Amino acid sequence: MVATLLRDDPAADVLIVERGDDVGGTWRSNTYPGAACDVPSALYSFSFAPESGWKRAHGTQAEIYAYLRRVAREQGITQRTMFGCALRDAQWDGDRARWVVSTSRGDLTADVLIAATGALSTPTLPKVPGLEMFRGTMFHSAEWNHDHDLTGKRVAVIGTGASAIQFVPSIVDKVEHLTLFQRTASWVMPKRDHGIASSVRSLYRRFPLIQKVVRGAVYSQKEMYVVGMTKPFARKYALPLFEKRARSVLRKQVPDPELRDRLTPDFAITCKRILLSNDWFPAITRRNVDVVSSALTSATENGVVDAAGNEYPVDTIIFGTGFTPSEPPVAQHVRGEHGRSLAEVWNGSPSAHLGISVNGFPNLFLMYGPNTNLGHSSIVYMLESQAAYIADA
């Protein structure tokens, strides 16, 4: 998004502080098997940097990471970035009308501070008694241990969200047994993924306008979901059709009525994120999979325990327990004109004007700020809109 600022003023004194060793954010860090985007490739790219080479309708982690690295290089972003540099503290100095920023590589000041740490950057682990005693291997899906071979292992997967729904089908054939802890069932819809023919990619390269038209059509189709989510008449008539479709998928792919009942959400569709997958239900109905309808309550030296006290022997625990979008860690390190941190001001309920600026924090702008996430389309569109707003400011 810095590219938006630099296009208006190429000479702008812009410095990016990045704690990682490369650009890419979540697509650099999340390398678990099966990692891919649930937003169509046509939308999951910057308007100023169209990509004609997507090989699938939904980009894979490797494709998206390569795209982000290329755009950063071409837009001159990497030359303005201090990699391996973590933010320690940022304090507004009212006397000088500047931000005083402390990092792991020294201090600096800035007229404007932009917090673009993302909503899916810090993995969260549940506080489970006994984890410190577990003798096996455990890791979060966002910090996948590629050195640990899962072949023939007894694996416990904690969580059934957007990450688990991708990596579980990718590992289920390798493991001896998989125990899946599901605290809350999710609505699952088919993922309209398919390969993009080389002839189509060539057409996009030769005639960029065609790709723009396709992008516009996909965007318009996705925006129709908003009507179903927000308009009373549509909620009454359209959402039941969505739910009927999701129930149909569940009925066809899960023959066991008892398991099907446990996999059926007890809330209306769109109240939580709809998950997209073609192989989730077939994966978790395999003979070597047990679905436990409870949270993980404790761990032992050699296993995990459910809410009913049943223990399951496992060699490996994989946490698909998500991130901290409602409590971004950066909020603890940014202090405004009264010396209070963002976390203290928000007090567990983040809010910001347009999701971008917060009263009492002058010249601070948030990217992917509170309440700007989407349940139907591409966050990239939101980020570009925020970047344009910040550039204007």
Residue ranges and their predicted role:
Residues 1-22, 108, 115-255, 289-290, ...:
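Rossmann-like dinucleotide-binding core of oxidoreductases
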